[in-house]
Amino acid sequence: GDACLVADRKNNELLLVCASGDIPYQRSTVEHPLRIETLRASYDNVKKQWVWTKPKDHTNEFYNKLFNNANPSMFMSSGKVCQSSIVKVGKYYRVYAALCTRKGNFVVYSDDFGDTWNVLGSATESCAPQGDEVKCEELPDGSVIISSRKDGGRYFNIFHFKDLKKAIGAWEVEVDSRKAKGG
């Protein structure tokens, strides 16, 4: 399925997150979900090529652990995973990825380059409840912004940290581009 990718800023490694399975996003259910998998690659300097791991299935982690089976369908937005230039926990700089669900958009993050994931902010209150095809990016102060497609415009929202390392903070209220002057 669609994939999103990030190259680690310090280690010669890649992280790819993709959709997988035999069901489309629109028909996915908790019982028969669109799967979420990661693959990692490291560069072999001797062979002069990238060596990929086998896919790691995170479906249960996302549906059950992170969202308590409350979201019937999830899709990691295709394109790019964002890596922080500020927050480093252990070996890796934090990565952020935008998640589409039928209950709105969320941002998830990993401090171990995709081995485990957490929700940025609330797992029950979406940062863009009516959003679709969401993207995220880190701002210069470490805050995270989302841009989410909506009918006739976009939603924007910003997560501000109270504690960067522990990922504690809150989302603002989403802004509808159609309601902004000149939007």
Q: For each predicted feature, which ranges?
A:
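Beta-rich carbohydrate-recognition and catalytic domains
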Residues: 1, 7-78, 82-183
